[in-house]
Amino acid sequence: MVNMFKHIKKSSNNSESWNKKEWQIAEELAVKYLKEKGYKILEKNFKTPYGEIDIIANKKDIIIFVEVKSGKGIRIQPSERVDDKKYLKIVKSAEFYLEFYLKNKNYKISQIDVIEIINGNIKHYENVGWDFT
């Protein structure tokens, strides 16, 4: 298997918790950031039988599935909470979206990104592993 997270370590459970309002603010920051970088937002909080994708965007015929992670980053970075189990849910959800919503569309490639937000600071990890081509 390809190293899925070139910049992200695997982690165990984390006791940090953010309330719903803080989580929504983090996603809004991620959407704003992506729009400023030229991405078109296709979906937010897209639910599938396999899980939820925080943001689905596209840029230059590339479909990007974005997982947003936020927190204080005291003991563990928020992006480190994207472990193999979470990654597999994102992959299955992305496959579902591509199969049922973009079946007849012509997109070149798709990728999974992780956006980490700590105290309003954004780190964007692009193409963290799985390639749909």
UniProtKB/Swiss-Prot annotation:
- Under the GO molecular function aspect, what terms does this record hold? nucleic acid binding
InterPro entries in the record, alphabetically?
Restrct_endonuc-II-like, tRNA_endonuc-like_dom_sf, UPF0102_YraN-like
Q: Which SUPFAM superfamilies match?
A: Restriction endonuclease-like
- Similarity comment: family membership: Belongs to the UPF0102 family.
Q: What is this protein called?
A: UPF0102 protein Fnod_1509
Organism source for this protein? Fervidobacterium nodosum (strain ATCC 35602 / DSM 5306 / Rt17-B1)
**Origin organism lineage:** Bacteria, Thermotogati, Thermotogota, Thermotogae, Thermotogales
